[in-house]
């Protein structure tokens, strides 16, 4: 059977010796297939006490469900996510950081994986398939969405905030923080934001209106977006900066706080073109071994790619902007 040729299928179980019943898996990173794990692995990535473990399982080939992808009927195992079903039938996702649909955070926060499910934009990475589900791959007619925290005024800013603007007495930026990240840093300072998949998602315009309101209220010199990782939902981020830049004075800093892992030259150019004028990149270190420990990325090749892209982004911004 064709799907048996695909890579192994894993589900998640609770290690009760590590679980402290903190409620994170109910209040922040919720399960969308409760009682019948489909292997999205969101809770595995998100659990702050590492109380989730992977267990090798199998695709339920005895219980197939019908799904319609752009009107074409396919039969897939019932115990998979929409994203997994798409991969099983041979549909590839776009690279992380591209404008197309991509599996970026895999925890449901960034919405970069969203497709049209039964006429509504929904995340493919954590949504289980169900019999009769209709999935559309063209999302251009829908406003991009993302889970966002804030805005809040900030005293110190972030990566790339000019040091001379910071006096620790006045608010220097009005900031928002977006959910979802392509790294797995165990020391993440915004853990509750990064792994949030339950909050109501917002459009770039909705967030733009809020952040501009508080920017004017607190008279900050900059507007900032951090995370999580802002760059992994490219459509959303570009539209956010376009909206904000068209409604505030040019002297206002429009600040991107990024890990730089997907900030390619064309991406940087596109952000600058829509008004982003303050790009802060954090490569984190120089050695790939250190990077793997800091970011939680076990795949050395991927870690090397991310580290190299981040440093190249620093150089490109410095040389050109």
Language model regions located:
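Iron-sulfur cluster-binding cysteine motifs and their immediate structural context
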Residues: 20, 24-36, 42-58, 112-122, ...
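Conserved alpha-helical substructure of the radical SAM core
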Residues: 192-223
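N-terminal [4Fe-4S]-dependent radical SAM core
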Residues: 6-11, 134-177, 190-195, 217
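Conserved AdoMet/S-adenosylmethionine-binding subsite of the radical SAM
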Residues: 212-321
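Glycine-rich phosphate/adenylate-binding loop and adjacent beta-alpha elements
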Residues: 44, 104-145
């Amino acid at each position: 059977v064709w799907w048996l040729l695909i890579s192994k299928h894993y589900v998640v179980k609770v290690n009760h010796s590590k679980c402290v019943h903190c409620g994170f898996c109910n209040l922040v990173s919720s399960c969308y297939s409760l009682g019948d794990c489909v292997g999205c692995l969101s809770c595995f990535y998100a659990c702050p006490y590492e109380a989730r473990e992977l267990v090798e399982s199998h695709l339920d080939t005895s219980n197939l469900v019908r799904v319609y992808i752009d009107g074409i009927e396919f039969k897939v195992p019932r115990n998979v996510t929409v994203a997994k079903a798409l991969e099983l039938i041979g549909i590839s996702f776009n690279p992380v950081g591209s404008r197309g649909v991509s599996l970026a955070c895999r925890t449901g926060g960034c919405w970069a994986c969203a497709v049209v499910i039964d006429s509504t934009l929904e995340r493919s990475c954590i949504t289980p398939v169900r019999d009769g589900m209709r999935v559309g791959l063209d999302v251009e007619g829908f406003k991009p969405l993302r889970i966002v925290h804030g805005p809040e005024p900030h005293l110190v800013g972030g990566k790339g905030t000019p040091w001379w603007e910071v006096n620790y007495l006045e608010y220097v930026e009005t900031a928002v923080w977006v959910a979802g990240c392509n790294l797995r840093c165990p020391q993440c300072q915004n853990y509750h934001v990064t792994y949030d998949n339950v909050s109501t998602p917002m459009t770039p315009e909705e967030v733009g209106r809020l952040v501009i309101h508080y920017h004017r209220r607190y008279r900050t010199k900059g507007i900032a977006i951090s995370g999580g990782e802002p760059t992994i939902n490219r459509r959303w981020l570009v539209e956010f900066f376009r909206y904000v830049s068209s409604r505030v004075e040019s002297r206002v800093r429009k600040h991107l706080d990024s890990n730089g892992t997907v900030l390619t030259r064309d991406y940087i150019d596109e952000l600058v073109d829509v008004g982003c004028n303050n790009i802060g990149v954090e490569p984190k270190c120089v050695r790939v071994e250190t990077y793997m420990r800091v970011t939680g990325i076990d795949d050395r090749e991927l870690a090397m790619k991310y580290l190299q892209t981040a440093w190249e982004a620093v150089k490109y911004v410095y040389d050109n902007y």
